[in-house]
Structure formats: C-alpha cells, structure tokens
C-alpha cells in the first residue's frame, strides 16, 4: 500500500484525525494525500485561498511531526464532496481512503450518519472510518466480522491479511450464526487456513444484529479496529437501505475498516 488519501474537514477534531492518518501512513510507509472538498459560496470568492492556506498549515505540521518520514501533499477541490473525493482517490491511485465522523456534534454523527457512512457503498478502495475524536495508538487486536452466507472473495481476504501483517496484530474473526451448517464450517476452516502462521481466532456467535453482537463481544474481547467486508448492492438498495457495514461504522466507538 503506497498512497493514503485523507478527506478532511476543518472541525475541531480535524487535527486528531490528521495525526491518526499520519501515524498509519508511517506504519505502512505510505505517502499521505490530504484533500478538502468544498462547495464554493458566491458570497465568498476567497474560499479557495483560505482553504489552501489551512491545508498547507496542516501539511507543515504533519511533516514536522513525522520528521519528513511521511510524504504529505494537499489538495483543495471545489465541487460536490462525494464526487470530488472519489476523483482525488482515482487521480492519486489511492490504496486507502480515510474519513472521520467529524460532526461537531459527535452523537448526531453516530445516530444520524454523515458523508463518510454515505460513501461506504461507493468506495472502490478500502475505506477507514474513524469515530469522532479518534486518537491513534498502536494496535494489538483487530476484529474481522465476516458473513459466510455467500462465498468470500479471496482477493479481499488477501487485503485483510496484508493489513494484519503490517499492523502486527492478532485477528479475531467472528461470524454471526447461531447454528452453522457443514458448508459454513468448511468455509470457516478454509479462511483459517489462509491466516495460518498469523495469530488469529475464529468464532461463531449468536445474534440477529451485528452491531449489538460486536458490542457484546467487545466486553470480553477488547479490540482496536473492526474490519468489515461490504456486500455489493444495486443502486436502489444504496439509496433506500443502510447496509450492515454502514450501520456498524455509524454506531461503533472503534475505527471501522471497510475492505473492498
């Protein structure tokens, strides 16, 4: 993974989000591209100048903190935020998109959602969603929530493995299933074989709501990150339904990494 794109706003939590992205980029030896997408106002023609100045200030601060070990660049892009962020991800050939639920009212972001959760079904690269006011700390344990009702893409599991190896974490794989049949037990066995040589566990857990199941699991199994494998949905479903990954990202107190 060579390039991370951080889509940032200028709320109070922006500095913490930038520090988190910087630490992660440093761990992966990746360059960090910071983008601020905004819709210019007719009554404020100097928006672009002020935006670029603030981004340059953030760039200088991060470059100083990393002592130059992370290449940091900035992009100010005016236009509809979703389209602008997706365009920068494509132009920079990003390997990871990072966004935060950075609403000035964190509980509003958690219960109502925001731009980051809206973008989960649209992302074409892995996407890390940070809860408000996230602070980076070295990770020890990652939870991978997996659905075995459909075949799991080996390429996507390969990306999961890469993240686990670089982060140097143990992996807790969970599947919400009260009574797994032989087919799902066999699928679980194949997945465990893929992670052979890496510290990991696999558990089938009862439940009907993954968010609740993850909360219950975290009581006895503390983790630093949740990984999800979003399913592909048609456009109609994207418009009218919230996916499981979106729901977990919106309500989780932990960062959520959607692997696509």
What does each of the following model-derived ranges do?
Residues 76-84, 210-211:
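Charged docking surfaces used in two-component/phosphorelay signaling
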Residues 209-219:
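A short, acidic, amphipathic alpha-helical segment used as a generic capping/interface helix at domain edges
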Residues 62-69, 194-197:
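Short helix-capping segments at alpha-helix termini
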Residues 22, 60, 117, 161, ...:
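Active-site phosphate/pyrophosphate- and oxyanion-stabilizing loops and adjacent acidic/basic residues
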Residues 1-46, 140-204, 219-226, 251:
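Small/aliphatic-rich secondary-structure junction motif
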Residues 71-74, 202:
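Rossmann-fold cofactor-recognition segment
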Residues 86-135, 219-221, 225-260:
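Gly/Ser-rich helix-loop-strand patches that form or flank binding pockets
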């Amino acid at each position: 993974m060579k390039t991370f794109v951080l889509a940032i706003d200028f709320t109070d939590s922006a500095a913490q989000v930038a520090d988190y992205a910087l630490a992660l980029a440093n761990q992966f030896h990746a360059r960090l591209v910071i983008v601020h997408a905004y819709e210019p106002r007719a009554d404020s023609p100097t928006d672009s100048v002020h935006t670029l100045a603030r981004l340059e200030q953030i760039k200088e601060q991060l470059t100083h903190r990393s002592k130059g070990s992370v290449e940091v660049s900035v992009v100010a892009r005016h236009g509809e935020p979703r389209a602008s962020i997706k365009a920068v991800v494509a132009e920079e050939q990003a390997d990871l998109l990072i966004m935060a639920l950075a609403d000035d009212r964190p509980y509003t972001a958690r219960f109502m959602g925001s731009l980051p959760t809206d973008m989960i079904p649209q992302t074409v690269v892995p996407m890390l969603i940070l809860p408000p006011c996230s602070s980076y700390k070295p990770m020890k344990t990652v939870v991978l929530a997996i659905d075995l009702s459909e075949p799991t893409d080996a390429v996507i599991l390969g990306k999961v493995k890469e993240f686990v190896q670089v982060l140097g974490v143990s992996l807790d794989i969970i599947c919400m299933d009260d009574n797994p049949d032989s087919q799902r037990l066999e699928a679980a066995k194949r997945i465990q074989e893929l992670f052979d040589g890496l510290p990991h566990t696999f558990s089938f857990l009862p439940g009907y709501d993954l968010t609740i199941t993850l909360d219950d699991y975290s009581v006895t199994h503390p983790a630093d990150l949740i990984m999800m494998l979003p399913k592909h949905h048609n456009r109609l479903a994207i418009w009218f339904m919230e996916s499981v990954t979106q729901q977990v990202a919106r309500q989780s107190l932990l960062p959520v990494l959607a692997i696509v």
